């Protein structure tokens, strides 16, 4: 078995789970960690460390935070770590000078069954598009985004009630297994790769923005439901709310479907003392939790304790 000297590259909590699994296995040496530069965040614009940086500091791992991956001083520091393998989990696109540096190459863990859902938000889009299965794939990085030769993939089912947060956590566990198995294959020199086949029906995991996170209530009930759960809890689906002379945007987090014929105007908000429902094509979306401007995320019944909606309330 070849001794692996690993540089790990990642930023969010998803990457921490993988890094921790490698460290706890204690088979290979983590010689360095690369993560995003510190950025101000929140209303106070206080400097916030990435989840991976927090972990690296706690474990006293060598840490690099380049702003430019082609910077000469960074490349010298990276080379001095003398790694023979780089691992990437939820980081950024690497220049060839970085991914081609180690003897054994650089592999990435991607949270989809490639070649489907290449891109920035694979977990979200699998749910938004109503997929019933997804998974993770490890592959060697090349000069394009998520197109390299695949090492292995692992699959799991998506239930109709799971949201982004639920699936994220399941895929992180599955991703740990995939990365450890990939490391074992590389260390023993028995990797067999598969080339990704490009076909016309490949689905893409587009970057999420304000426009594609907006709820379109003219779509059918299942599409509306899937969008909301695919964006919950982050970045969250949103829509405009209007009642009487007030109009503002709200976030919707958790919902249920009620398939039922009705004659309400699409987007009508129907309330009881404990429930909020929205009329959509093919039924009602029951809102379980939501957030109004200037308020924290609340359960629907909590919001209704202090707020009355008129019969003309609408979302759009």
UniProtKB/Swiss-Prot annotation:
It catalyses: L-methionyl-tRNA(fMet) + (6R)-10-formyltetrahydrofolate = N-formyl-L-methionyl-tRNA(fMet) + (6S)-5,6,7,8-tetrahydrofolate + H(+). Transmembrane segments: none annotated. Disulfide bonds: none annotated. NCBIfam families: fmt (TIGR00460). It is an enzyme of class 2 (transferase). The gene is fmt. This is Methionyl-tRNA formyltransferase. It comes from the Bacteria. One of its GO terms (cellular component) is cytosol. Keywords: Protein biosynthesis, Transferase. Pfam families: Formyl_trans_C (PF02911), Formyl_trans_N (PF00551).
